[in-house]
A protein has these predicted regions:
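A surface/secretory-pathway sequence property marking extracellular, secreted
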Residues: 60-88, 136-139, 153-158
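Bacterial N-terminal signal peptides
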Residues: 8-18
Length: 161
């Protein structure tokens, strides 16, 4: 009887370890028109058992971001700029995204090159761990394996047509 329970427990742990990632940072919409001003939304869920306390997004070189919606209540926003003054990313901090919750961060941008744009993001949790969403983007409809709390997960991708 005890051996059966141990086997069942081991199987449950193995299944959880191989579970697909059900939540990751997304950029919406996933398909945009070339040279059209677009409202982009970065959707950030908290998929760990620790709240999210900061989010950094690196903008793809093929998209010019030029305006930001106000940061959600309790959050501050800091634009990241290149040496030439162009906006290359944004950092949101100061608030929390509770366990099981999500928050949207919105800004305007214009894509100026066709093809796939990759939006790398870095999610900081209340325990100080940073989850890089900087790996290769998933294929449409694919669900990646969970890579753990600090290993790179798939970056978000937007197709420019």
């Amino acid at each position: 009887m005890r051996a059966g329970r141990v086997l069942i427990a081991a199987a449950a742990v193995a299944m959880m370890a191989a579970a697909p990632a059900m939540a990751h940072i997304d950029v919406l919409p996933q398909r945009v028109e070339l040279e059209q001003s677009t409202e982009f939304t970065v959707r950030v869920p908290t998929e760990r058992e620790v709240p999210t306390v900061a989010v950094r997004v690196d903008f793809p070189r093929q998209v010019t971001v030029y305006a930001f919606a106000p940061a959600p209540r309790g959050w501050t926003m800091t634009q990241r700029r290149a040496a030439n003054g162009s906006v290359i990313g944004v950092v949101y901090r100061g608030g929390t995204i509770p366990v099981g919750g999500y928050l949207d961060f919105t800004f305007l941008g214009t894509p100026f090159s066709k093809g796939q744009t990759v939006w790398k993001a870095y999610q900081t949790y209340g325990d100080g761990k940073v989850k890089p969403w900087s790996g290769p983007p998933e294929d449409p409809g694919a669900i990646s394996e969970e890579s753990g709390p600090t290993a790179p997960g798939p970056a978000a991708a937007v197709q420019v047509v």
